[in-house]
Amino acid sequence: MGKSRGDKYRDATDGKKDAKKDLNELKQELAMDEHQISLDELYARLGTNPDTGLTSEQAKTRLDRDGPNALTPPKTTPEWVKFCKNMFGGFSLLLWIGAVLCFIAHGIPCWCAGEPYLYDNLYLGIVLAAVVVITGCFSYYQESKSSKIMESFAKLVPQYAVVIRGGQRIDAPAEALVVGDIIDVKFGDRVPADIRVIKASSFKVDNSALTGESEPQTRTAEYTNENPLETKNLAFFSTNAVEGTCRGVVVATGDRTVMGRIANLASGLEMGATPIAREIAHFIHIITGVAVFLGVTFFIIAFILGYYWLDAVIFLIGIIVANVPEGLLATVTVCLTLTAKRMASKNCLVKNLEAVETLGSTSTICSDKTGTLTQNRMTVAHMWFDNKIFEADTSDDQSTANYSRASSTWMALSRIAMLCNRAEFKPGEETNPVLKRECNGDASESALLKCVGLSIGGVTGYRTDKPKVAEIPFNSTNKYQVSVHQTDDGDERYLVVMKGAPERILDRCSTVLMEGQELHMDDQWRESFNNAYLELGGIGERVLGFCDLRLPADKFPRGFKFDIDEPNFPIEGMPFVGLMSMIDPPRAAVPDAVSKCRSAGIKVVMVTGDHPITAKAIAKGVGIISDGNKTVEDIAAERGVPVSQVNPREASACVVHGSDLRDMTPAQIDEILENHSEIVFARTSPQQKLIIVEGIQRMGAIVAVTGDGVNDSPALKKADIGVAMGITGSDVSKQAADMILLDDNFASIVTGVEEGRIIFDNLKKSIAYTLTSNIPEITPFLIFILADVPLPLGTITILCIDLGTDMVPAISLAYEEAEDIMKRMPRDPFRDKLVNERLISMAYGQIGMIQASGGFFVYFVIMAENGFWPSRLLGLRKQWDSPAINDVADSYGQEWTYTQRKRLEYTCHTAFFASIVIVQWTDLLICKTRKNSIYQQGMWNHHLTFGLFFETTLAIFLSYCPGLEHGLRMMPLRWTWWLPVLPFSVSIFIFDEVRKKFLRTLPPGNWVERETNY
């Protein structure tokens, strides 16, 4: 039995509900307990053996059941669908309708009379169709170029993994891993699946792409947190192992991994229309409304005036088509493409042309911290020794060091940092500046290595001369690292060096090194230590303590066997040497970029997975939290009261912890967004980033989200515009984004915002310029119907304007320099439209009417010079257009044949065309600016100067080129017929300069602004 229609409908509805339900489930925090239960219980659940792993048969069965360990590729739009969207979407649809109407207008006389009266409508229909096809192909080509760049990015999935199968240690393709496999991961590998750690040796992973934490995270077999993303006994698919080794059991593969869930969350989100797409749709509604209104009105008038119904229908179609700005689709496409190219040269790759303008509409930027605002490179920022805090010198020549590099305490501190350190420079990096050298090892240890490499130099040789004989690696229980070294400095004693958490190091020290002297550790010194530790930790820096000790030669002679499992050498009673603190520093250009955003009315919100203290410190460093603005915690600390006693609305800044966000309702999130101007969200999960973006969008903001990690991809997809990082960004984030920063620099976004605002302004100018000539193109047709005069302007001539003389000048406005755009508030997408009633009023009702008046003046002048006074022209249409009448008398009684009349009519068409070109000169100049005088703006846009030259040259060519009187019905003009329209052109310039003077000088909100400022 087949399903009834009702059943099918219910199935479809249920499918949508299920999809929505699945998406809501993905938005929930991770629900898993594999990290909480004991290992034995986990082995039993997964049916595996920690020593022998799975058998080949078990692995094959599970692979068949669960599928390969790979992320399902995101659904891509078929190329033919992309092509059709460019061919039939938005503005193209209006032109297609125009083309169809032209074919109908051509076909009606053919159908009724057996042969067409004129081929104008056929030509117009063909040209309209050609315009759509050419611009559609052009847009498709631009988008496909961007997608090819996207396809060239590296693949995410690791290729091979070391797995225990049937007791054998083998290399297997990562895609063949299944739940229950026992795998080994070592330094340099990419974790091939979600694993529960069974045992680990100094194992650290870089989780920055997944959680946003800039420091490598230690992974051990112990369960430390109920949150799967924060516990130490889980390592996740596609994160990188940066130190040590680990054995683990696979608990999830493919789409069921944390990475897979996030990727599915991103691909499951629905994307709304871009602001520019909504603007173009709004514009089409306006143009269609005006066209249909005029068409129907004059159809009724023509009917009342006694026109035959067939003629009235052709009039109706003609007026609708005359309202269609044929060249505007090409103009908008080319303008967006030019801006996209300009942005690409400034390191912004636009995947979708419409995203160009969206960035300019942005009112809130949600930025990731690690790698976007910061350099994703841990750097030593401060040192504390000899009871003073010193700023680290990061200059290549060490010219800004404010401490003595010869200080014995500094030499001792740098010696420990060099020796108690597993990081090393990669081979072949010797010729590069120290700060730019690639390192193998932990990010913090690499920072120490570069710091002492800059200050002391020769790290590799120094280590060779002082070989390591024993080492206790750092672990999360002891929180320190110890190594024992032989030295070549004439001292036969072994040197023990130690670094770690400052409080743990302090516990193992009884004296302190001060200016080369070993002194007793008193309470005053301890207070200084605590103050320094709190100060450095309070600005978000990771602080490490350092100490060393010479072992007595009689007890520890050369060749002594050191035991690291149960140390047989002293690791207490050591002299404390100093502190060194590190931070992932902000990018140099970011503070200025944030300042520009603020002056442009754009709110910058930090959303990071990193620690709140670090996030707050970076936010203050880059200006997201301004100087003087305080959080609730700052106010409470100042007053010496609990945080609960401070009204949150007193604080303009706010740092929200992910654990607090988890328990908030949408209304509470909205309250935070409304009441705080400067916001930092820290320790957020990918699901929470998405919820934050949705909350900001609920406030009516247009949101741009920046990020490089997989954890950013759902938010990137949901945002009005997602901006991914090209260098450090994951493939998942690049797929989800609309734009890619090729240099990973937040400052490039501000460039993008500026370009987006410029293009919105310049598109307005182009549209205003293009629409204005619609009135002198439509009114001849209306007068032709109402006054029954010979047609002042032909259809073919209109095409010469729309697709000829107007095109290059309209496109040249895309190059116009900005007026105060980065000092304005972001545009309100609901009120500040690309085409609003004020623009229509200016283009159609004011400038357009002056242009039409100029055209009619020229028309009547030429007719009068040839004997037809205006009074004689009224009601003359039927006689004039009849091929059978060859004796139409003019005002002086001279008789005109049909051929003579048509030659005069085509001369009038050409003159009307020339007059439109001349008034469009001035229209182009006044469209250069929206408020500034042309004398303020200047004529520095050379493309516009070329546009003026081009349209004039083309008009002269079309008017005087032999043979065009047959193809385009263009007749040579007397030079005097170019002159009558000049006063109208000058009056347009004077009118608009006076209007702009009022806009600049009258108070904001004045009537001129309300009525004419588009």
From Swiss-Prot:
One GO CC term of this entry? plasma membrane
**What transmembrane ranges does the database entry give?**
124-144, 281-300, 313-330, 764-783, 794-814, 834-856, 909-928, 942-960, 976-996
InterPro entries found in the cross-reference section: ATPase_P-typ_cation-transptr_C, ATPase_P-typ_cation-transptr_N, ATPase_P-typ_cyto_dom_N, ATPase_P-typ_P_site, ATPase_P-typ_TM_dom_sf, ATPase_P-typ_transduc_dom_A_sf, Cation_transp_ATPase_P-type, HAD-like_sf
Q: Which reaction does it catalyse?
A: K(+)(out) + Na(+)(in) + ATP + H2O = K(+)(in) + Na(+)(out) + ADP + phosphate + H(+)
Ribonucleoprotein as a keyword of this entry, yes or no, is no
The subcellular location is: Cell membrane
Q: Which GO terms of the molecular function aspect are on file? A: ATP binding; ATP hydrolysis activity; metal ion binding; P-type sodium:potassium-exchanging transporter activity
- Annotated Polar residues bias: 49-58
What does the entry list as the binding residues for Mg(2+)?
D708, D712
**Membrane topology of this protein:** Multi-pass membrane protein
Oligomer and partners = The sodium/potassium-transporting ATPase is composed of a catalytic alpha subunit, an auxiliary non-catalytic beta subunit and an additional regulatory subunit.
Role: This is the catalytic component of the active enzyme, which catalyzes the hydrolysis of ATP coupled with the exchange of sodium and potassium ions across the plasma membrane. This action creates the electrochemical gradient of sodium and potassium ions, providing the energy for active transport of various nutrients.
Q: What is this protein called?
A: Sodium/potassium-transporting ATPase subunit alpha
The beginning of the lineage is: Eukaryota, Metazoa, Spiralia, Lophotrochozoa, Platyhelminthes
